[in-house]
Amino acid sequence: MITIWVPKRLVEIDLYNVAARSPQALADLSEQSYAQRVDYAAQKVQLSGAKIVMLTGPSASGKTTSAHCLAKALQKRGTPAQVVSLDNFFKGAEFYPRLPDGTLDYENPDTLDLPLIKQCLRELSEMGKTVLPIYDFSAEKRSAEVEPIDLQGGVCIVEGIHALRSEERRVGKECRSR
């Protein structure tokens, strides 16, 4: 498994000066830096030959946005890429564990249908295609509709807060060895 890590630098005084003089320039600089990091990640993914890339992070950290940016960067480099959200593998509200105060624990790994995740990742690795569930967030249950996905020889970017749990990593290793 390759790991792509781009460490953050300490904030320099020049950056504070840019922010004070021109907030728009700071935003532009940040966007440019982000785009360079995404392009670097796309280059690493492409060179690795990986079929499946797992992207994780805390809630609301930009996983979905980053996954779609990475897919676009790979496509610009000539590698087909599609994004799969682990959110679509939620079992449904009736299966969610509860927090001590009685509210549903949406971030508990047990909310995900792990056997179905494994099945879909294996199919993507072995055949390059699978059928994905669709989760209906307004109804808090899995939709009857499904989404077929065909990698067309490209890369699948799987994003979710539990994408790098030990079970998912084990599936990734099994898929890579085939």
Please state what every model-predicted region is.
Residues 72-82:
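Post-Walker A helix-loop "phosphate-sensing" segment adjacent to the P-loop in P-loop NTPases
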Residues 169-175:
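Conserved small/polar residues in nucleotide/adenosyl-binding loops
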Residues 1-40:
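Charged, amphipathic alpha-helical linker segments immediately N-terminal to NTP-binding catalytic cores
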Residues 53-55:
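Hydrophobic anchor at the beta1->P-loop junction of P-loop NTPases
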Residues 60:
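Walker A (P-loop) phosphate-binding loop of P-loop NTPases
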Residues 66, 70:
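Hydrophobic positions on the alpha1 helix immediately C-terminal to the Walker A/P-loop
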Residues 82-84, 91-138:
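Conserved nucleotide-sensing/catalytic segment adjacent to the nucleotide-binding pocket
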Residues 63:
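Conserved lysine of the Walker
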